[in-house]
Amino acid sequence: REAGTHLLTNQDMGYEYRSSKYKRERKPIIILEATFVGGHADPQASLDLLHDLTEKRKKTQPVGPSFGSTFKNPPGNFAGKLLAEAGMKGETCGGASFSNVHANFIVNHGNATAQDYYCLIRRGQKRVKEQFGIDLQLEIELLGEFHDVE
């Protein structure tokens, strides 16, 4: 394992949809800082766009505690749509549930454990596989040991 701080470019990271070179190769790194270079834009137009996007997000994604999107979108489809059509919205395990706003988000109701999240992840994967023949791939990384209970 290389110790120390390294400067990596966008190309070094090998970014792809919901992935990077380091994620694919399972090389643990910690990103301490990132610099983004963008084009020039009107400051007020940028603020207006940010406001519009924030308002849209409030209407389409849960605002409570969650870890964001749980599953990657399969080619030609949307994980949230598949989960919703499979009846997963509101599905609960312990202190966690699939969001009623967007089914690809699992929300914590204050006392959820990692096992509660895992229970819902497996339940969602199973139901989507049974109904649509699609294997949902995790967007998140699981840390720890989990057991199937169903």
What do these predicted regions represent?
Residues 2-119, 126, 131, 135-150:
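Phosphate/pyrophosphate- and phosphate-bearing ligand-binding catalytic cores of soluble enzymes
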